Curated annotation (Swiss-Prot):
Contains a conserved PPE N-terminal domain and a variable C-terminal domain. The C-terminal region includes a SH3-like region, a leucine zipper DNA-binding motif and a functional nuclear localization signal (NLS). Residues 400-417 have a biased composition (Pro residues). This is PPE family protein PPE2. It is found in: Secreted; Host cytoplasm; Host nucleus. Residues 8-164 are annotated as: PPE. It comes from the Bacteria. One of its GO terms (biological process) is response to host immune response. One of its GO terms (cellular component) is host cell cytoplasm. The gene is PPE2. Inhibits nitric oxide (NO) production in activated macrophages. Acts by inhibiting expression of the host inducible nitric oxide synthase (iNOS). PPE2 is translocated into the host macrophage nucleus, where it interacts with a GATA-binding site overlapping with the TATA box of NOS2 (iNOS) promoter, and strongly inhibits NOS2 gene transcription. Reduction in NO production in turn facilitates intracellular survival of the bacilli inside the macrophage. It comes from Mycobacterium tuberculosis (strain CDC 1551 / Oshkosh). Keywords: Host cytoplasm, Host nucleus, Secreted, Virulence.
Amino acid sequence: MTAPIWMASPPEVHSALLSSGPGPGPLLVSAEGWHSLSIAYAETADELAALLAAVQAGTWDGPTAAVYVAAHTPYLAWLVQASANSAAMATRQETAATAYGTALAAMPTLAELGANHALHGVLMATNFFGINTIPIALNESDYARMWIQAATTMASYQAVSTAAVAAAPQTTPAPQIVKANAPTAASDEPNQVQEWLQWLQKIGYTDFYNNVIQPFINWLTNLPFLQAMFSGFDPWLPSLGNPLTFLSPANIAFALGYPMDIGSYVAFLSQTFAFIGADLAAAFASGNPATIAFTLMFTTVEAIGTIITDTIALVKTLLEQTLALLPAALPLLAAPLAPLTLAPASAAGGFAGLSGLAGLVGIPPSAPPVIPPVAAIAPSIPTPTPTPAPAPAPTAVTAPTPPLGPPPPPVTAPPPVTGAGIQSFGYLVGDLNSAAQARKAVGTGVRKKTPEPDSAEAPASAAAPEEQVQPQRRRRPKIKQLGRGYEYLDLDPETGHDPTGSPQGAGTLGFAGTTHKASPGQVAGLITLPNDAFGGSPRTPMMPGTWDTDSATRVE
């Protein structure tokens, strides 16, 4: 920048920009870093110089020692120069930081500028009959002085800082430590593009293209009509838009020999479409319909040819990588199948046995097997030992089945389910023991009247009681065991109250002046048992035919 530019801005702008910046702190920190780097370079150079001096002094004799010293000499010189450059860079940055501090000290502050504006306003407000003309002129001249001072300060700061940055030395890359006459290492990887070019030249395709196709392309490209049309933005567009151009040996060698990866594929296509977009924009900007039409045609051919060439290179590279990875991937793919190939003979026989199921296709289905009667589950309430049942077991008649195989295993009865009997819930229904004794007496009387079975069915009927006696004998002691309800339950004594008519409900009905009469008769209405808890409940359900009419109270 020049002084007039700084002079064109008011001092408030320069003061605000200079005072609101980061200050000289970052420059001083950077200068300290360059000083440290210079010291590190110097220490490394001293160490290497001492090592080379020891080699020359006789630690390592022979011609190889001289070669070793000669190989390290350029690197030693670079270390010394890098140390000097780093020190110079630190000095330049310190100079720029000092210039910044000087400019900040010489720049009028925002407070001074604000005070000048405030004083100018007061003088203008109190300037009656021009009495403040001289103070106003002095204040304005002071503001002009600050304006010039700010511009001069910025110009000086720019000159010093620019010179410091421009004079900063640049360090070159470190030289390699190699033998002076060492041959250049040849690349181990062959150039496939060059190999394809040599093959195309060997078969004569290169000569045919150079002698026949390329002259024709050049003639089309150099047509005055096309040259005048595209000379303004892309004179090579007629050549790139010619499909014969993509048949050149260089393009074929690129498609078949360049190792294309996904990133390069995307980068090449992006670059091509960027060029095509620029050509289309220039053609539409010209406004010439012929230019737009030819540009669309040529760019379409260029896009198709580039996509085909790059896609061939990408597919070829992916196929080569896949074939190279197959030897390493086959063991990984075969690892899950190894247990099947190394399975023991027993496992193989198990799989081979499944083949016998194929012979069952032609065998007719057999009759369903007859399931023998399942033994009834024993009741959980303890009962006395029953007498033999008179009824013989029914004989199941089954249809004959062909001898196709071993008979199915017999179905065995499930084991009797044992659990807490109803006596454990005596607190819900009272006098369970008496009810059990009554049922025992009734059951015994009924079974005593059963006629004896015939002699032919006697063994079968005699075996039935034995099967029922054992569960009952095992369940009988459970009544007296712990956790059976009677251990911690106190039953209320039987009061023996007779059931009476309920005083609740509709109340006394009839004519006025009638009285309540309780007379024996047929039970009707609502019947309750007064003062009844659990102990005085009926032992058997009351049915209409067994109601006790004497103990009921009729509500009339």
